[in-house]
Amino acid sequence: EAGEECDCGAPANPCCDAATCKLRPGAQCAEGLCCDQCRFMKEGTICRMARGDDMDDYCNGISAGCPRNPFHA
């Protein structure tokens, strides 16, 4: 929702303040295929394995999401 940095539905999430729906101090992310222990995973980390004729997708180091490779089938 607007103004939220993270999903405040899970009070046990160590990255997200459930009362404010904001990331806790020092946290870069709260969830996502490229988020590990509240930090963005290193650029080049595989976040989605290739299937069929597709290629692996990799974290970019600046986002919690797993960007699709430009050659996604």
UniProtKB/Swiss-Prot annotation:
SMART domains: DISIN. Keywords: Angiogenesis, Cell adhesion impairing toxin, Developmental protein, Differentiation, Disulfide bond, Hemostasis impairing toxin, Platelet aggregation inhibiting toxin, Secreted, Toxin. It comes from the Eukaryota. Pfam families: Disintegrin. PROSITE patterns: DISINTEGRIN_1, DISINTEGRIN_2. Residues 1-73 form the Disintegrin domain. A motif (Cell attachment site) lies at residues 51-53. InterPro entries: Disintegrin_CS, Disintegrin_dom, Disintegrin_dom_sf. It is found in: Secreted. GO terms for cellular component: extracellular region. The keyword Secreted applies. Its main location: secreted. GO terms for biological process: angiogenesis; cell differentiation. Disulfide bonds join 6-15, 8-16, 21-35, 29-59, 34-38, 47-66. Expressed by the venom gland. Signal peptide: none annotated. GO terms for molecular function: toxin activity. The keyword Glycosyltransferase does not apply. Monomer. Belongs to the venom metalloproteinase (M12B) family. P-II subfamily. P-IIa sub-subfamily. The disintegrin belongs to the medium disintegrin subfamily. Inhibits fibrinogen interaction with platelets by binding to alpha-IIb/beta-3 (ITGA2B/ITGB3). Also inhibits ADP-induced platelet aggregation. Inhibits basic fibroblast growth factor (bFGF)-induced proliferation of human vascular endothelial cell (HUVEC), and vitronectin-induced migration of smooth muscle cells (SMC). It also regulates platelet activation associated with HUVEC migration and invasion, suppresses TNF-alpha-induced ovarian cancer cell proliferation and invasion, and inhibits angiogenesis and tumor progression. This is Disintegrin saxatilin. It comes from Gloydius halys (Chinese water mocassin).
